[in-house]
């Protein structure tokens, strides 16, 4: 089966989070149309995501060998988790990230997660001559779902969407060339504004799915 890796980065319960509400609607609809996909989920506020430290590494983006390195049990478990997250990321076909817009970017746990999954000999290759992504070995695509309280004018999206732009740049460097966005703009201050923004985003879901290369498109 193909794998859809669903990554959320919001501490709110799903029903209170617009990004997670639309994320759930998206993956449910996608799997309805593409039942050959299985879903794996990572909640960056609930799951253990190590904060990278020098003790985890033996070289540039290269974690230590747990079998030979002189490290304590806690560090060994952290290194194993870093490798596990990176391997899980490598094994996926479709990635869906659901995140709110915070301070022109995204919540900090997403950056810590990205740092974990970008590892030498798993998702990138690091040599003295070059650093290159390794995820161009098969068809992979990403959908970035972002909620924001206000409407972001088209002309200023490059200024205010620094988080989205950063994620797109990193994924393309890794080898994930097709990047789709689903914006939940204008969630506002009232429950009515929130529901209206979510309804508008739900209407966009099928069009995003149609652009995904390996989708059955309904």
Swiss-Prot record:
Instruction: Name the top EC class.
Output: oxidoreductase
Q: What is the UniProt remark on how the cofactor binds and its stoichiometry?
A: Binds 1 FMN per subunit.
- Cofactor(s) annotated in UniProt: FMN
Oxidoreductase keyword on record = yes
Q: GO molecular function terms here?
A: electron transfer activity; FMN binding; oxidoreductase activity, acting on NAD(P)H as acceptor; oxidoreductase activity, acting on NAD(P)H, quinone or similar compound as acceptor
- The keyword Ribosomal protein appears for this protein: no
Under which EC number(s) is this enzyme classified?
1.6.5.-, 1.7.1.17
Name the keywords, alphabetized.
Flavoprotein, FMN, NAD, Oxidoreductase
Known catalysed reaction(s)? Answer: 2 a quinone + NADH + H(+) = 2 a 1,4-benzosemiquinone + NAD(+); N,N-dimethyl-1,4-phenylenediamine + anthranilate + 2 NAD(+) = 2-(4-dimethylaminophenyl)diazenylbenzoate + 2 NADH + 2 H(+)
Q: Which SUPFAM superfamilies match?
A: Flavoproteins
Residues recorded as binding FMN, renumbered to this chain, are 17-19, 147-150
Q: Which InterPro entries match?
A: Flavodoxin_fold (IPR003680), Flavoprotein-like_sf (IPR029039), FMN-dep_NADH:Q_OxRdtase_AzoR1 (IPR050104), NADH:quinone_OxRdtase_FMN_depd (IPR023048)
- Pfam families hit by this protein: Flavodoxin_2 (PF02525)
Q: What does this protein do?
A: Quinone reductase that provides resistance to thiol-specific stress caused by electrophilic quinones.
Assembly mode? Homodimer.
Q: Write out the similarity annotation.
A: Belongs to the azoreductase type 1 family.
This chain's protein is named FMN-dependent NADH:quinone oxidoreductase 1
Origin species, per record, is: Clostridium perfringens (strain 13 / Type A)
């Amino acid at each position: 089966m193909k794998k859809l890796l669903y990554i959320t980065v919001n501490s709110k319960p799903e029903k209170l989070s617009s990004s997670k509400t639309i994320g759930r609607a998206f993956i449910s609809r996608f799997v309805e149309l593409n039942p050959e996909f299985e879903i794996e989920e990572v909640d960056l506020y609930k799951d253990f995501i190590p904060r990278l430290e020098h003790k985890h590494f033996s070289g540039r983006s290269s974690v230590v060998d747990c079998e030979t390195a002189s490290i304590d049990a806690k560090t060994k478990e952290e290194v194993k988790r870093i490798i596990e997250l990176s391997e899980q990321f490598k094994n996926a076909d479709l990635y869906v990230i659901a995140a709110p817009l915070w301070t022109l970017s995204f919540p900090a746990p997403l950056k810590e997660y990205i740092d974990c999954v970008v590892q030498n000999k798993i998702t990138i290759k690091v040599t003295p001559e070059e650093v290159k992504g390794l995820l161009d070995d098969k068809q992979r695509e990403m959908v970035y779902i972002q909620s924001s309280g206000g409407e972001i004018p088209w002309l200023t999206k490059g200024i205010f969407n620094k988080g989205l732009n950063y994620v797109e740049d990193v994924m393309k460097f890794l080898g994930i060339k097709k990047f789709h966005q689903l914006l939940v703009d204008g969630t506002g201050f009232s429950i009515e504004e929130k529901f209206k923004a979510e309804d508008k985003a739900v209407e966009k879901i099928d069009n995003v799915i149609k652009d995904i290369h390996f989708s059955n498109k309904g």
